Amino acid sequence: MGIATTQAIFPAVESGDLDAVRRLLEEDPGLVYVRHTDPDVHHWTPLQFAAAKGQLGACRLLVERGAEVYTNPMNSYAPVMQAAWNKHAEVVKYFLEEIPDKAAGTNGLGVAINLAARQGWIEIVRKHIDRDPLSVHQRGWIGDSPLHWPSHNNYTEIISVLLDAGADIEADEINCYGGKPLHWASEHAPAAVRVLLDRGAAVNSRNLKADSEFCGMTPLIMNATQKNDCAEVTELLINAGADITAVDAKGKTALAHTRERGLTRIQEVLLAHGAA
């Protein structure tokens, strides 16, 4: 069977033609495992593709035929996340409420704790902790701890739940960008920054990932590199003792980064606090 033949399942899925999908699977049951050849579609499986397109009927059929429910290759995310990010609520509900037990490696909850925390699904986060207290240390596929994404996305209640359960406030993301939860929050999440600082996050911690473009950055420098121009975070960090003279691995201060990027709001705060 050639590549063109294996790819026929994808347009059938996208159009919602269940008869065609069923016929193709009867001819070759292994089609549930093929990958899309177009890199712009992230080499998705048919189930990831169906979830992203909101085709609930196709999702059901593919799962019935043995599709892997919690597919998580190194260049993409599981079907439930494709559905969530494309705002297909009924498909998300199917994965999380009807077949969560089919999602391997998720404590029978349908999604890993890291991604539940990323989405703000606090009840699922709580259930993970109840079923596996060590899940607060689980790593996502980019090396993130469960604290990284809720810190980035300003989900303060989830941050508190994780910290109360023993999550490491100084955990480094180890596979992609680097940085601790405070670095991630410092991009644009003032409420998360406030909670992390109140809970003891080191305000002058460093991004330790040597091959990251953010290597050596403190949370303040990280804040000064982001297009959000979030001066509220700048104030919080400085008031907590952030070193405005600190430089990153390239020898640049927060002020230097703001000038390069035209971040006038952050620059104004830095200058008001004596940056030069």
Regions found by a protein language model. Give the residues of each.
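Solenoidal tandem-repeat scaffolds enriched in leucines and small polar residues
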Residues: K102, G110-I124, R131-D132, G140-D144, ...
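Intrinsically disordered, low-complexity regulatory segments in ankyrin-centric signaling systems
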Residues: M1-D28, Y33, T37, V41-W44, ...
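A generic tandem-repeat structural signature
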Residues: G66-R118
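Ankyrin-repeat-protein effector appendages
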Residues: G2-A8, G108, R199, A240, ...
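Ankyrin-repeat boundary/"N-cap" motif
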Residues: I3-I9, R35-P46, N72-A78, G105-I113, ...
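Ankyrin repeat A-helix N-terminal signature
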Residues: P11-G16, F49-Q55, Q82-H88, L115-W121, ...
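Ankyrin repeat domain, specifically the short helix-to-loop turn at the C-terminus of the second helix
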Residues: L25-L31, R60-E68, Y94-D101, K127-L134, ...
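Conserved ankyrin/ankyrin-like repeat signature
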Residues: A20, G57-A58, E90-V91, I124, ...
